[in-house]
Amino acid sequence: MKVFCGMLIAAATIAAAPMALAQAPASGTAYVVTYIEILPSAQGEAAGLLKQVAAASRKEAGNQRFDILQRIDRKNQFAILEAWTDLKAAEAHAAGAALKQFKDKLKPIQASFYDERPSKGIAVAPSPSSVGRNAVFAITHVDVTPPNTDGCIAMLKKLADDTRKETKSEQFEAWQQNNRANHFTVTEIWKDRAAIDSHVMAAATKDFREKLGPMSGALYDERLYKSL
């Protein structure tokens, strides 16, 4: 019986791996945000591996975006922002050799698990063709209690509309996590650090955060990055 139960658990673990992508809509752009934490002594090695997988991934069929980012205040933390034309393209990438080789090489220097969050877009916009060297990326994980999911979506869409009117906003998007509908990722690109500091003080931003507070299921987790 113990052997049989062990086999069931192993099978469930294997089956769970593609579930997050499988729960995404079959049509429409597929998005993925990945958080990576590396041993502090291995920052340079990780940056090199990220550049390699980015170069390979951008050549794959259906890739629309593959941004590799390094956190400004904790340089051993990285993020990947991906967009694929549809679920099929995202699944092909997830099962492909380039990503597998990247994960295999990354594993020995990881300080935490490979935190990959497939998502769908709820407030999206075209990516800029290029960004300046002073550009700052912000990624925020927003978690609300399940009854507040629809309200949060409406608020995120309004914040996106308001933010895109700011002169130094280069992109603002909100994604909804496939396997947890009450979890969201906000991705932003700003011309420079002063621009995002100004955005934080904007009336629309303060109004959003004030209203989000009572709805939240976790801390408002905003992280700032530079492009590699």
Where are these regions (language model features)?
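Short, well-ordered beta-strand segments in beta-rich or mixed alpha/beta enzyme
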Residues: 30-37, 67-94, 134-143, 173-200
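Glycine-rich beta-strand-turn "strand-cap" elements at beta-sheet edges
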Residues: 21-30, 67-76, 101-137, 171-180, ...
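Short amphipathic alpha-helical segments
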Residues: 42-64, 98-101, 146-170, 204-208
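Structured core of small recognition/catalytic domains
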Residues: 150-228
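Bacterial N-terminal signal peptides that target proteins for export
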Residues: 1-9
